[in-house]
Amino acid sequence: MPRRRVVATREILPDPKFGSQTVAKFINHVMSHGKKSTAERIVYGALETVSQKRNIEDPVSFFEDVLENVRPMVEVKARRVGGATYQVPMEVRPSRRTALAMRWLAEAAAKRSEKSMALRLAGELNDAADGKGNAMKKRDEVHRMADANKAFSHYRF
């Protein structure tokens, strides 16, 4: 984090199939070891599976709705005051909300037990759309932590 000037955010090129920057960013989250074509195959396969299962014409809008479900509104940050560390609830900035939601979806999908990663991701997207699944559980856990520590909100930065 530089002290002098604000670093410009990098523009991400939209994905080739849907032309969506959101999907392109999610592909980058799913990608491991630089294997982008494999990550694209996984994400496109998952969106295809979900759109067939739910009879959806526009999988991108469905994906954005799922992301909206998983996005956290508040989180806790550790703040040291007078020798004690408090978990202070803070509002999450929009770019971090999206990044956290994508990270949680990818991690939750990787932990599932379906056969292929595309099927795991499809299952997790389906569950998140219904308000279930590990990604939603993670979001609720973060919200619960923030709610439990509401008493320390006056220690905001």
Swiss-Prot record:
CDD domains, alphabetized: uS7_Bacteria (cd14869)
Keyword entries, A-Z: Ribonucleoprotein, Ribosomal protein, RNA-binding, rRNA-binding, tRNA-binding
Gene3D superfamilies: Ribosomal protein S7 domain
GO BP terms, alphabetized: translation
GO terms for MF: rRNA binding; structural constituent of ribosome; tRNA binding
Pfam families documented for this protein: Ribosomal_S7
GO cellular component terms listed in the entry, alphabetical order: small ribosomal subunit
Function: One of the primary rRNA binding proteins, it binds directly to 16S rRNA where it nucleates assembly of the head domain of the 30S subunit. Is located at the subunit interface close to the decoding center, probably blocks exit of the E-site tRNA.
Family: Belongs to the universal ribosomal protein uS7 family.
Quaternary organization: Part of the 30S ribosomal subunit. Contacts proteins S9 and S11.
Protein name listed in UniProt: Small ribosomal subunit protein uS7
Organism: Psychrobacter arcticus (strain DSM 17307 / VKM B-2377 / 273-4)
